[in-house]
Amino acid sequence: MLAIKTIFKYLLGTFLLIQLIQVDYENPPVNKHLEIQAPKEVMSILKRSCYDCHSNEVVLPWYANIAPLSWEMSRHIDLGRKWVNFSIWQTYTPEQKDKKLEELYKSVYRVMPLQGYVALHPKAALTQEDRKLLRDWTGKAPF
């Protein structure tokens, strides 16, 4: 029993210590002129289901300040923005936009939004109608 208490104390102490390693996270400034332009229905879906990882308008939940969750969330957002950042869409070349739309076409049926994200943010779930609308909007039917 003493060993269990000792292990618990060390784990608790470690958990408390890692809280000192905070992620310095801020959204970059948003320039609406650089944002993606899409029909209202498409923008609604993108903002609801994609913007928390793929824009400069991330709304962090309360648990985003708890390590190690904060580290993983920061990593996911950084990776998401590298893949596509809807806040800077107009800075992409036509070729980059075309490629990103093609990837969006594929990913809305395969992996996005991530299941772990949807589990914590049920409103972000895409319906079949949402998925079809996004795919139709991209204009990237399979070759």
Predicted regions and their residues:
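Hydrophobic membrane-insertion alpha-helices, especially the h-region
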Residues: 6-22
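Electrostatic cytochrome c docking/interface patches
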Residues: 26-46
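The canonical Cys-X-X-Cys-His
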Residues: 46-57, 112, 134
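Sec-exported extracytoplasmic/periplasmic mature domains
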Residues: 51, 55, 78, 106-109, ...
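Short cysteine/histidine-rich zinc-coordinating motifs and their immediately flanking basic loops
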Residues: 62-68
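Extracytoplasmic electron-transfer domains, predominantly the class I c-type cytochrome c fold
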Residues: 71-120
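C-terminal capping alpha-helices of c-type cytochrome domains
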Residues: 110-111, 118-143
